[in-house]
Amino acid sequence: MVRDYVLARAEGQCEHCNEPAPFTTPHGRPYLEAHHIRRMTDGGPDDPRFVIALCPNCHRRAHFGHDATELNEDMLRHVAAVERE
């Protein structure tokens, strides 16, 4: 599952701000949210090259921030670099 892969790839850190997950889940896992940089509802793929693990604040910013478009483009470049490694 793409979500599980992306959360594991993040190793407990937000892939945008690099801060540790803000808390752990009841199962002891770091809490991060999978963000589809190209939204699936807009035809974006469910592919690790287009999904990033974010803390809740960065996730909200990616959707509702005044700089959301630029932020998502930066995230896309970051994920492309990580997936090439």
What are these model-predicted stretches?
Residues 24-27, 35, 65-67:
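Short Cys/His-rich "knuckle" micro-motifs
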Residues 11, 15, 19, 33, ...:
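Glutamate identity and glutamate-enriched acidic tracts
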Residues 29-32, 59:
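Active-site lining segments that contact anionic ligands and/or coordinate catalytic metals
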Residues 1-22, 29, 42-45, 79:
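Short, charged surface segments at domain edges that flank catalytic/cofactor-binding sites
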Residues 19, 56, 60:
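Short Cys/His-rich local motifs and their 1-3 flanking residues in nucleic-acid-associated proteins
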Residues 38-53, 61-85:
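Polybasic, low-complexity binding patches
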Residues 12, 32, 49, 53:
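Cys/His-enriched microdomains
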